[in-house]
Curated annotation (Swiss-Prot):
Pfam families: Thymidylate_kin
Catalytic activity: dTMP + ATP = dTDP + ADP; dUMP + ATP = dUDP + ADP
HAMAP family linked to this entry: Thymidylate_kinase
Keyword Transferase carried by entry: yes
Cofactor: Mg(2+)
UniProt function note: Catalyzes the phosphorylation of thymidine monophosphate (dTMP) to thymidine diphosphate (dTDP), the immediate precursor for the DNA building block dTTP. Also able to phosphorylate deoxyuridine monophosphate (dUMP) with lower catalytic efficiency. dGMP and dIMP are also phosphorylated but at much lower level; other nucleoside monophosphates do not show any detectable activity.
Name of the molecule in the record: Thymidylate kinase
Taxonomic source organism: Drosophila melanogaster
GO molecular function, one term: nucleoside diphosphate kinase activity
Length: 211
C-alpha cells in the first residue's frame, strides 16, 4: 500500500453512533502502521471560533435558525480547505469523520431544500472515497451515550438516513455502503481492502471539487 504522489481524501459518513469514529481510527492506525503518512480529521472541527459556536448548538446550549447553523457547518469546512489541500498534495492521506454530506443530510432532514443545502459545498475538495455506514437508527440507540447531543433522536435520524440514501444515488461510484451492524473487525477488513486498492489509483490523479 503506497500513498504515492498525493494522499487520498477518505470520508466516513453515517447516522449518529453508526461506528464512524471507531472505523476511522482503525483505518488511521492501519495506514500509519504501514508507513503511509496519514492524518485524522473530523467535522465539525470544534476548536475554531466557528466550531465553538457549532459545539454550543450541538450540546443544546445555544439555539440558531436552521439556515444559519447549516451555513456555519459549511463555513467550518471552508475554513480548513487550504490545510486539507496542502496535506493531500504533500502526500498525506486524510481520514475524515463527517464532511459535506452530513451537512446536507442533517439540514435537509430538518426540511431545508436539498439543492439549497448542497450549494455552499460546491467547490470544496471532492473525496476519493466515502465510506457510508448504514444501519436502521433503532439499532443504534443502545450504543454509548446515544441521545447526548441535539440530533440524536431516532425519528430524526431516520429522516437523515433517507437523505443519505439520496446522496448516495447522486454521488455514485465513490460512495461505498456498508452494513454498520456487522462486527467491527469485519467492517474494518472490508474498508481496509478498498483503501488498499484506492491509494495507488489516486496518487497521480488531480484533485477535484464538489459540483
Amino acid at each position: 500500500m503506497s500513498a504515492g504522489k498525493r494522499g487520498a481524501l477518505i470520508i466516513f459518513e453515517g447516522c449518529d453512533r453508526s461506528g464512524k469514529t471507531t472505523q476511522s481510527r482503525l483505518l488511521v492506525e492501519l495506514l500509519k502502521s504501514k508507513g503511509i503518512p496519514t492524518l485524522p480529521m473530523n467535522f465539525p472541527e470544534r476548536s475554531s471560533s466557528i466550531g465553538q459556536v457549532i459545539n454550543s448548538y450541538l450540546t443544546n446550549s445555544k439555539d440558531l435558525p436552521d439556515e444559519v447553523i447549516h451555513l456555519m457547518f459549511s463555513a467550518n469546512r471552508w475554513e480548513h480547505i487550504n490545510q486539507v489541500k496542502e496535506k493531500l498534495l504533500e502526500g498525506t492521506t486524510l481520514v475524515v469523520d463527517r464532511y459535506s454530506f452530513s451537512g446536507v443530510a442533517y439540514s435537509a432532514a430538518k426540511g431545508l431544500d436539498f439543492d439549497w443545502c448542497y450549494a455552499p459545498e460546491r467547490g470544496l475538495i471532492k473525496p476519493d472515497a466515502v465510506f457510508y455506514l448504514r444501519a436502521p437508527p433503532n439499532d443504534l440507540t443502545h450504543r454509548g451515550q446515544y441521545g447526548k447531543e441535539r440530533y440524536e433522536k431516532v425519528e430524526f435520524q431516520g429522516r437523515v438516513a433517507e437523505v443519505f440514501n439520496r446522496i448516495c444515488s447522486k454521488e455514485g461510484s465513490y460512495f461505498h455502503q456498508f452494513d454498520a451492524r456487522q462486527s467491527v473487525e469485519d467492517l474494518h477488513a472490508q474498508i481496509a481492502s478498498i483503501t488498499e486498492e484506492l491509494l495507488p489509483k489516486v496518487a497521480t490523479r488531480p484533485l477535484d471539487t464538489l459540483s
